[in-house]
């Protein structure tokens, strides 16, 4: 791609209207966690900035992150790849292969040195000179380091890239590790998850593409807008936790009624992610909503914290029946469950009122 176009020019080329372009910019602004005041800046950047060149490398992994990426709904992955970035190299998404494909990688690195965004999916294999993960006939470690040297910014997609992934589980026979110790001082944003949420992946690359800088990061190099809250804090089952109402096994009445999964091993109280906010498949669902406890897949070394159904050590203070009203307010649309909870609440109120009445009579005797 000799003459790179702007995002606006690509919209025009595809016959899309100005209205569609503005709507896309508004959606991107929201996705990136920016205020409505930033819409004009996003529009301006999308109008004039050339599409960013992106190189996507695959290390020791399962391509699950790519599979997640192509399911992004806002923006659509197809729109992103065809109209919003210039994806020059990707093992999974590119049509080319073989020696010409590898030659194109090296040509792109030289042509856009210091300008391209490098996305890395997968771990680095360190044992036996990296022979357990080969790419283009070479150890992936060598290719990754060469390409990383010329990158403007690096995105570590998935828990394999950020901390080694499943293949790093004890005893880690391949010596798999995250990429950060091998990329030098190049700015890097970590996007953990097994896999990450699709819109988190697209949101991060678009932030760098439009503003030329990494998004605000936390102490672990993760974008704050997507990893600023615990799964526990945004969970729709949280009122049950506060009320002390827990499923004891996967087929009891509590589980069927949607009670808290803490006692079944849920890692939500210690896991930072946007699962409860963004969810998956256009906001349809996420593991906890499907009845499975969070396994903490954005946490480093989560794969060794097994069994996943084992309860975490005591966390905070559970609620009591007096707090059940909180659950009622949050679960007003859950039909039978809300009715059952409301009944308990009313009984508690009656008992409390009766106790207060008896106490008052005693004081007046």
Over which residues does each language-model region extend?
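N-terminal export signals
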Residues: 20-42
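A conserved mid-domain beta-alpha-beta active-site/ligand-binding segment of alpha/beta enzyme cores
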Residues: 201, 206-279
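Alpha-helical transmembrane segments
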Residues: 332-346
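Cytoplasmic C-terminal tails of single-pass
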Residues: 351-365
């Amino acid at each position: 791609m000799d003459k790179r176009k702007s995002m606006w020019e690509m919209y025009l080329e595809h016959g899309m209207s100005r209205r569609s372009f503005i709507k896309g910019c508004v959606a991107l602004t929201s996705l990136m966690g920016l205020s409505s005041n930033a819409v004009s800046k996003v529009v301006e950047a999308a109008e004039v900035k050339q599409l960013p060149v992106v190189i996507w490398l695959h290390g020791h992994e399962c391509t699950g992150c790519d599979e997640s990426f192509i399911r992004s709904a806002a923006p659509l992955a197809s729109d992103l790849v065809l109209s919003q970035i210039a994806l020059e190299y990707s093992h999974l998404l590119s049509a080319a292969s073989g020696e010409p494909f590898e030659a194109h990688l090296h040509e792109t690195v030289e042509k856009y040195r210091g300008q391209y965004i490098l996305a890395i999916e997968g771990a680095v294999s360190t044992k036996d000179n990296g022979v357990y993960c080969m790419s283009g006939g070479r150890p992936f470690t060598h290719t990754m380091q060469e390409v990383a040297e010329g990158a403007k910014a690096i995105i570590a997609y998935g828990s394999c890239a950020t901390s080694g992934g499943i293949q790093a589980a004890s005893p880690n026979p391949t010596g798999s590790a995250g990429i950060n110790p091998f990329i030098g001082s190049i700015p890097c944003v970590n996007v953990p998850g097994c896999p990450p949420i699709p819109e988190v992946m697209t949101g991060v690359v678009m932030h760098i593409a439009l503003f030329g800088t990494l998004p605000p990061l936390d102490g672990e190099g993760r974008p704050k807008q997507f990893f600023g809250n615990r799964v526990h804090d945004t969970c729709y089952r949280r009122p049950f936790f506060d009320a002390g109402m827990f499923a004891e096994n996967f087929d009891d009445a509590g589980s069927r009624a949607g009670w808290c999964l803490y006692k079944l091993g849920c890692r939500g109280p210690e896991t930072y992610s946007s699962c409860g906010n963004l969810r998956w498949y256009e906001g349809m669902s996420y593991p906890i909503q499907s009845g499975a406890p969070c396994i903490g897949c954005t946490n480093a070394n989560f794969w060794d914290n097994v069994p996943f159904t084992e309860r975490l050590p005591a966390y905070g203070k559970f609620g009591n029946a007096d707090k059940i009203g909180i659950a009622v307010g949050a679960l007003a649309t859950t039909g039978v469950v809300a009715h059952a909870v409301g009944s308990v609440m009313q009984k508690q109120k009656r008992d409390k009122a009766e106790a207060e009445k008896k106490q008052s009579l005693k004081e007046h005797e």
